[in-house]
């Protein structure tokens, strides 16, 4: 009996044939830079995909291993002169693995719970967050670390990346509308994410303050869902498509000039919802309209222009490019433009800022050793700048870099671009 078809578009011969094996992607690829193994380079992985997809070779343990080790950072797309859309190819390969490869019971159960039974349900995210918050604040975390039980279970490294759960969740802001300060320059709908609602509430609040301070009316649509990025990157395409449909139906009802996100990983997927649907599907045209209105908050503010007063910040700051902002959305200058607009800020470029920090969605949980290698290199470069603050544009990168600052004792603060803008704007407000 034939397996069911994979929903959505399928790569064709021409998509793979664009790769001419020139090798210009090699130095851009984090895993190739670490190991210098052809099979763990973009062109090496494409060669393996061709064997499976075009030559009908079986999916082997080796194939799965090399595809799993890819961060899907898409730096190879930036480097590629032939326009290979590697992200589409690797995510389809993962969808094939999801359908055809028998993972272990534990791996299959974990993936099924995370992608199909947790992320699509905000109330379950909140319930799990409350349990984690109890673990973090009751003293259990300190005890577990102190007696070595995490190390015994092989969880010590992964637990470093466990986000600090907020006291108040951002979900209570869903359904609210925030008026612009002064004349209204734009009306925007804010996409608040999923995990960010319980771990980055302050970032979401700062995003709203910065937008309203710069003349934007901000509506936070009620009952919005996870964007589906993590599911799409993992090859769980059915879950990603279901989430996309829900967000399309919700946000396309909003009368707004733009749909704003402060998460580069979410933004890349939101802009590319059409990649999840075939051209003949009704959702494809809806997804194209949705993507055309979606903007990263740094992209939107840089284009709109900052008009809020800002207090000088005497800080030396460096910026780590978020992969799905730089490589996925091709946005490099917008965050730098905003940082340079802050009075007295000393901005210094981070060496190799275009190389992934190792977060890559849940990569730091599934490929923890590799993630820590990339993080160690990133923190060495960050220390070389002598910056007091590392700035980035994605919550996942924030978690990774904050863990790096702790583990490597760099004594560097890690903030989102809008958090730094919010700090400067708050300092310029008259004291009541």
Over which residues does each language-model region extend?
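Short His/Asp/Glu-rich catalytic/ion-coordination signatures at enzyme active sites or charged loops
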Residues: 54, 75, 79, 235
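N-terminal glycine-rich anion-binding loops that anchor highly charged ligand groups
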Residues: 24-27, 37-42, 217-220
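Short, intrinsically disordered, charge-biased short linear motifs at domain edges
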Residues: 4-16, 57-67, 179, 212-215, ...
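Cysteine-centered iron-sulfur cluster-binding motifs in ferredoxin-type domains/subunits
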Residues: 13-32, 60, 64-84, 324, ...
